[in-house]
């Protein structure tokens, strides 16, 4: 344990010092400090006057309290003086109130006006919002009025039905949190909690009565202005009906009822008769169902379907169809069934084991060649390629497959295959030297690709004995150069042309400047590479060799006559080195402009500097 403490003493010591700081007794320290203050004696005037710290502190505290009291007393005196001055001025001023008690300083604009109270005569008894019954009997218990449904707070479940969300998806409020969604709008723009007074059905009866009067007088779709005014005077402000939003028939025009409010659409007067009788009976039936509050549901407006117009126009077969339009249903018709001919369905993958039929479809190339050229016109030039535009894609596909098969056959057969083919061709030429008509499946080209037509059918002319020899399968390829088709030759030429033209297409302003710089700096750099290496001592020896004796003067221009510019620079550096070694002396004419190109050299010694240092002895050593 002691070993561990001795090893980690430098780590434990700060912790011990920190614990000692918490063991300090503050009271004891203060007591010791006070004792030291009592023992300390500070005297002035040779010991006559002594100083005590406690007395000095009390003296300072007392002087501060006295000073603060003096400041407060001075503050109160200042305010008393100000009050006295203001009261004195007020007493000296004459009073503005006269003997009659009228104040001259005050002005009254409506002094002589009589007091008028708010008149209540303009309130119409018909337009009151309070309905009182004459036979009303006071009950002992007061009935608490029901809270309007518009003021009843909705439940949380109802709020979740139609929430109002922000752009971030946060739920801000609900539809029923706004009064405009729970109250009834008034024509004046206010939102009413509940309808009071007449119901919307009474307004409908009044309009119907006006229509009956207008029918008896022979007027249609019009109401006299007097009756209209009477109707407006009879209506209550709170009983004005609200316009009904029509969602049943949006495209139908608005019906004019003579009032201009558009509360309920009514039928035209021209259609009076059985319809009006039925409507009147329906209204009478609905009257029986009115409750005590006087509210009934309005009749649902019958949806009028527009009669479709008969189209006599001929349909346009090229017109673009509407994807959302309901198409005319057509009966299903059974189509014709076509069977695939034998040979086409053989390539289809099927798990059923079927017997292969011996009959197959005719080869397309044979059929196409026989159709395109029947062999009777052997001497005439034939057209290049197929004559049918629909067969062109299939034709070129078959040609590419044949060319690929020929290349593979050339690689496998090699030189022996070519020898056998040449022998067979020679035998055929000996048998029939005249030109025989070619096979039907042989296609000939008159274009540039006709160079490979001689070896086009090499695979078909190979005898069976050569094909079955196992030795021919081991022959190494690359004995013959593959015959190129016309398309590949064109493709190679185009690629070569593009590669050569890229350097012209990629030339920019920067590349032109770089090329000019290379053309300019290339010869100079090559010339500098051909220069010999610079040896300053060698050039110094050459410069001193041009002097015949010591002390002779020569201008630098005369020494550098017929020298190359780079040689002059090298000799200049060598002359400066010689002047530093005190081998030559450099001088020029005075003046800035006059001293140009007037450098002259005088030879001081023909011995080299390093040779002089070998035989040099210091003056201190030579004197000894």
From Swiss-Prot:
One of its GO terms (molecular function) is chromatin binding. Residues 442-457 have a biased composition (Acidic residues). InterPro entries: CNDH2_C, H2_M, H2_N, Ncaph2. GO terms for cellular component: condensin complex; nucleus. Regulatory subunit of the condensin-2 complex, a complex that seems to provide chromosomes with an additional level of organization and rigidity and in establishing mitotic chromosome architecture. Keywords: DNA condensation, Nucleus. This is Condensin-2 complex subunit H2. One of its GO terms (biological process) is mitotic sister chromatid separation. It comes from Xenopus laevis (African clawed frog). Pfam families: CNDH2_C (PF16858), CNDH2_M (PF16869), CNDH2_N (PF06278). PANTHER family: CONDENSIN-2 COMPLEX SUBUNIT H2 (PTHR14324:SF3). Its main location: nucleus. The gene is ncaph2.
């Amino acid at each position: 344990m002691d070993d561990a403490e001795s090893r980690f003493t430098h780590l434990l010591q700060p912790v011990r010092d920190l614990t000692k700081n918490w063991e300090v007794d503050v009271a004891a320290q203060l007591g010791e400090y006070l004792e030291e203050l009592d023992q300390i004696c500070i005297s002035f005037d040779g010991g006559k006057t002594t100083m005590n710290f406690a007395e000095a502190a009390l003296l300072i505290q007392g002087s501060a309290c006295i000073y603060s009291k003096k400041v407060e007393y001075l503050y109160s005196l200042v305010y008393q003086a100000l009050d006295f001055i203001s009261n004195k001025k007020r007493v000296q001023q004459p009073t503005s109130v006269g003997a009659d008690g009228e104040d001259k300083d005050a002005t009254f604009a409506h002094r002589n006006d009589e007091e008028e109270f708010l008149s209540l005569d303009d309130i119409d008894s018909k337009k009151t919002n309070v309905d009182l019954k004459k036979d009303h009997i006071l009950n002992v218990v007061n009935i608490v009025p029901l809270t309007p449904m518009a003021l009843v707070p909705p439940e949380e479940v109802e709020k979740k039905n139609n929430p109002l969300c922000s752009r971030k998806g946060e739920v801000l409020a609900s539809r029923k949190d706004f009064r405009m969604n729970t109250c009834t709008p008034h024509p004046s723009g206010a939102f009413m909690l509940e309808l009071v007074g007449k119901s919307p059905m009474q307004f409908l009866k009044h309009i119907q009565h006006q229509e009956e009067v207008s029918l008896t007088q022979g007027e249609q779709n019009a109401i006299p202005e007097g009756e209209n005014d009477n109707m407006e005077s009879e209506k209550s402000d709170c009983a004005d009906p609200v316009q009904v939003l029509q969602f049943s028939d949006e495209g139908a025009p608005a019906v004019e009822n003579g009032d201009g409010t558009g509360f309920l659409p009514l039928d035209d007067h021209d259609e009076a008769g059985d319809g009006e009788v039925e409507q009147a009976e329906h209204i009478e039936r609905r009257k029986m169902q009115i409750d005590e509050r006087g509210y009934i549901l309005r009749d649902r407006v019958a949806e009028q379907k527009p009669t479709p117009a008969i189209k006599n126009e001929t349909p346009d077969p090229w017109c673009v169809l509407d994807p959302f339009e309901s198409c005319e249903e057509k009966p299903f018709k059974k189509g014709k069934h076509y069977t695939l001919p034998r040979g086409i369905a053989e390539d289809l993958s099927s798990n059923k084991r079927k017997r292969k039929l011996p009959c197959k479809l005719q080869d397309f190339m044979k059929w196409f060649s026989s159709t395109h050229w029947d062999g009777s016109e052997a001497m005439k030039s034939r057209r290049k390629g197929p004559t049918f535009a629909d067969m062109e894609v299939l034709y070129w596909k078959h040609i590419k497959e044949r060319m690929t098969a020929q290349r593979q056959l050339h690689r496998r057969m090699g030189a022996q295959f070519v020898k056998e083919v040449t022998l067979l061709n020679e035998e055929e030429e000996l048998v029939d030297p005249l030109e025989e008509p070619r096979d039907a499946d042989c296609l000939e080209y008159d274009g540039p690709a006709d160079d490979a037509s001689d070896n086009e059918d090499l695979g078909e002319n190979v005898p069976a004995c050569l094909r079955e020899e196992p030795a021919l399968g081991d022959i190494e390829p690359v004995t013959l150069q593959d015959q190129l088709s016309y398309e590949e030759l064109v493709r190679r030429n185009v690629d070569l042309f593009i590669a050569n033209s890229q350097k012209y297409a990629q030339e920019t302003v920067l590349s032109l400047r770089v090329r000019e710089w290379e053309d300019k700096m290339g010869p100079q750099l090559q010339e500098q590479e051909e220069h010999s290496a610079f040896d300053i001592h060698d050039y110094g020896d050459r410069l001193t060799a041009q002097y015949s004796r010591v002390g002779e003067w020569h201008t630098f221009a005369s020494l550098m006559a017929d020298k190359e510019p780079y040689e002059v620079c090298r000799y200049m550096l060598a002359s400066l080195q010689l002047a530093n070694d005190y081998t030559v002396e450099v001088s020029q004419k005075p003046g800035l402009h006059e001293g140009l190109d007037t450098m002259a050299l005088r030879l001081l010694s023909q011995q080299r500097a390093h040779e002089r240092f070998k035989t040099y002895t210091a003056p201190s050593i030579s004197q000894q």
